Amino acid sequence: MPRYRMTIEYDGRPYKGFQAQASLPTVQGAIERAIQAFCGEDVRVNAAGRTDTGVHALAQVIHIDLEKAWPAATVRNAINAHLMPEPISVLEVSVAEGDWHARFSATERRYLYRILNRESPPALDRGRVWHVKKPLDAQAMHEAAQALVGHHDFTTFRDLACQAKSPMKTMDLATVRREGAEVVLEFASRSFLHRQVRSMTGTLAEVGIGRWTAADVKAALEARDRTACGPVAPSDGLYLTAVRY
């Protein structure tokens, strides 16, 4: 039974997250229906990251096991054809080696968050950025973000509904930079807690507008208390950008 590794991108706006849910539109559900239409097999899609409602992906990694062996290009093209007009695209397909697993073999996941920082609202990127009117100090945000790098208890930045066994995570990267009218945040870790990136982003935005200081972010992290978190950023600007193995 061949295992196919796929890299996909999607616009998360129409979906109630990646993970399949009965009677609700999800990315996983759309892909599984496309596969069934292609080859008649009922399969389960496994993903590197189970993104939330409205979250996008530029390079989500998934795998499926099929009874029949197909050329990788055929799998890609057929699934894409049956996905239309869903805003999901299979970019790459290859046959996985050994016991490789999209979720459990991953060693790093990267997320990017886009904040549109200007007075005027977005027209073309509505639903793809978080619009913040007040001027943000990206350098101050970046400096504050460095308190998040390393191995920490991230209870403060963990959603109360998070089902992870432990709040301990190692943040390998936390950067903030300005690109014209946008402030872009990037985070890298082996894995993340539920709504961790959005919680950190919303908190760092408080630094950007001058309500919080870098010391406040450090104190919030050390509090290990969800009530110490700043506002949670909306899903609109969040993208899964890379998975490493």
PLM region spans:
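Structured-RNA-binding interfaces characteristic of tRNA pseudouridine synthases
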Residues: M1-Y245
